[in-house]
Amino acid sequence: MYVFKALAGIVLALVATLAHAERIRDLTSVQGVRENSLIGYGLVVGLDGTGDQTTQTPFTTQTLNNMLSQLGITVPTGTNMQLKNVAAVMVTASYPPFARQGQTIDVVVSSMGNAKSLRGGTLLMTPLKGVDSQVYALAQGNILVGGAGASAGGSSVQVNQLNGGRITNGAIIERELPTQFGAGNTINLQLNDEDFTMAQQITDAINRARGYGSATALDARTVQVRVPSGNSSQVRFLADIQNMEVNVTPQDAKVVINSRTGSVVMNREVTLDSCAVAQGNLSVTVNRQLNVNQPNTPFGGGQTVVTPQTQIDLRQSGGSLQSVRSSANLNSVVRALNALGATPMDLMSILQSMQSAGCLRAKLEII
């Protein structure tokens, strides 16, 4: 009996060391409380000769004519305006939850034509619409571009992106979105990641603090909470719930591979079983040169001939069979994979093969 209690205490101690507490607000979000996307089309003026080439972007000229006509200025028909300080842009913003009329939000401005840079430009008044084609905000202001560039004599240098910028507090909310917050007696908490264990732990924590039946786990991602009626009561109720702490168990072992950049990221739960790996590299080098053959005598009547010369080199480095020991923690996994001497691109194929062979104890996600 005493041995059983001692073993149970050791197991509970190990579980406690593996788990750590996090607030419910860091693990969940309130269903329905989210941002909405806004988009608009506008003009940027005041560019230092880096705007759209209007002969190649007719929509810029058309937009400018429409804007001038609204201001009472008529451009004669057939006029070919050669402008370099105007650019057509797309403006995007995020409409925050519970936004009120008169509140300001940030906007992102991106070039739509062939403008070289938006640095120093000013966005003219641009209506921002939602998916329902209703105008919810108006954007205008000076654009802040984070990049820099210079060109002279056919040479150019550029740091970061010049065709996009940001206007802090550049849009004013003109229309409010209706909200259903406070209308019902239940609110759903959505977990950031689907996890049956975590959903049940959040449910138990709320029931212990607010009484049995206050929360119910609907599925692996949704926890339904009974709340008092009224906005102010629900705000106070959610504030208390979101600050509750829940013991978080270890996450699922996962390896994420970015197929575009070749980066590999794994969490600390990844483990390896013993296996043997052989990786061979195949490299092909193609070298093409143009040889110019001229006649020996200047006036002999011969012709200058350009003949291409191509060399192809094929090399294959055979990879020897290397043993990978079983690894119980992340540091051991990293050391075992580094011992293979594989590049990140090779490592992607190796990890896929390890999972197929049952040696990689983790979920493999390719993005």
From Swiss-Prot:
Subcellular location: Periplasm; Bacterial flagellum basal body
InterPro entries: Flag_FlgI
Keyword field: Bacterial flagellum, Periplasm, Signal
Molecular function via GO: structural molecule activity
Region forming the signal peptide: 1-21
Family per similarity comment: Belongs to the FlgI family.
Name of the protein: Flagellar P-ring protein
Lineage: Bacteria, Pseudomonadati, Pseudomonadota, Gammaproteobacteria, Enterobacterales
